[in-house]
């Protein structure tokens, strides 16, 4: 894996030199109309995911809009490193493009925890409307910029939902359930607020953990639940819709600033098209995943309005914790007209 990564990065660096030299005069520009090496885009996600669809569409659009003079190669499955390594390599300019879930970015950019405000939105369209709000997006671009990245946009995989063997009909049904979560203090605080027992665990251990009863439940987007067949070990999917599963597309600030204005515009336009396409694909895939789960006999439970209100009330300490660590202006811009929901 290390040798593979080294070859890819060496190729990228060699190509970057050639590409830069091709900007010197007309003769060399004509000779270097097409990059010798494609720019790498790294992702830790598997291939059959919305993350990969987002990345591939972006690369395709960059090539199309540039008339084939700008090329990007997508490397999924952590070929270029895990989430942390990808962020570090992107900041240093070694891997110019990264597509990933926002959760791992909180360590590098604490303000990204604004997306960990639980149980705020009722539909994914509401989330998208708020995420795309120009004022909020401008603030987030500043957050990423201060950390050494250029934020090109957010796609998503819908909401995160819970799978369990317990028929959840009231708040008390969450009590005592050992639920696997990511090692994120805000995510864990949410489940503790509901009375559950959050248990961080490596994702590769989740299926066998459910099978052996080490954990009672887990939470993920529908796509992850189906692609990893987690529903096979669970009787119910509970549509807690507690958090949107956002996917960011970022580029190294150092790399981006080295491009011409025309190239930057091509990248921004390609990112916008890819974002909309990925969202459409996500909606279609979620509908298909729900059908797969229902046909398996696993029951899907939707929470009523009363339960959503109770959950928001229980989550007040979580909101307060996030508000202490995230810019107040950023929280206000993200929540917008939904701020009253959590007060």
For the regions a language model picked out, list residue spans one by one:
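N-terminal lobe/hinge region of extracytoplasmic solute-binding protein
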Residues: 1-4, 160-161
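Sec-dependent N-terminal signal peptides of Gram-positive bacterial secreted proteins and lipoproteins
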Residues: 3-26
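N-terminal secretory/targeting leader peptides
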Residues: 23-126, 135, 144-343
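Short beta-strand-centered segments that line the small-molecule binding cleft or hinge
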Residues: 129
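Short, flexible, basic/aromatic active-site loop/helix in glycosyltransferases
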Residues: 141
């Amino acid at each position: 894996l290390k040798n593979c990564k080294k070859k890819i990065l060496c190729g990228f660096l060699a190509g970057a030199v050639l590409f830069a030299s091709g900007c010197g005069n007309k003769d060399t520009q004509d000779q270097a109309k097409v990059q010798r090496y494609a720019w790498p885009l790294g992702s830790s996600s598997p291939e059959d995911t919305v993350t990969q669809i987002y990345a591939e569409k972006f690369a395709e659009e960059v090539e199309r809009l540039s008339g084939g003079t700008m090329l990007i190669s997508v490397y999924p499955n952590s070929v270029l490193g895990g989430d942390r390594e990808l962020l570090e390599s992107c900041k240093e300019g070694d891997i110019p493009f990264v597509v990933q879930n926002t959760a791992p970015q909180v360590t590098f950019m604490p303000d990204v925890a604004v997306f960990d405000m639980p149980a705020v939105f009722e539909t994914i369209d509401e989330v998208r409307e708020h995420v795309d709000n120009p004022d909020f997006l401008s603030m987030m671009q500043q957050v990423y910029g201060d950390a050494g990245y250029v934020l090109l946009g957010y796609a998503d995989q819908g909401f995160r939902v819970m799978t369990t063997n317990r028929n959840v009909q009231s708040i008390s049904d969450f009590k005592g359930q050992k639920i696997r979560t990511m090692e994120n203090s805000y995510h864990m605080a949410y489940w503790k607020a509901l009375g559950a027992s959050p248990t961080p665990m490596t994702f590769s251990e989740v299926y066998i953990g459910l099978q052996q009863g080490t954990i009672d439940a887990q939470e993920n987007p529908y796509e992850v639940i189906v692609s990893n067949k987690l529903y096979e070990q669970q009787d119910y999917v509970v549509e807690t819709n507690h958090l949107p599963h956002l996917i960011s597309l970022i580029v190294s600030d150092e790399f981006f600033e080295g491009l011409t204005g025309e190239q930057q515009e091509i990248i921004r336009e390609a990112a916008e098209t890819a974002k909309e396409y990925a969202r459409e694909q996500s909606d279609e895939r979620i509908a298909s995943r729900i059908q797969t789960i229902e046909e398996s006999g696993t029951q899907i439970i939707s929470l009523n309005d009363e339960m959503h209100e109770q959950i928001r009330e229980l989550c007040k300490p979580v909101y307060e914790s996030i508000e202490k660590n995230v810019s107040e202006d950023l929280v206000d811009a993200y929540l917008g007209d939904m701020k009253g929901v959590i007060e």
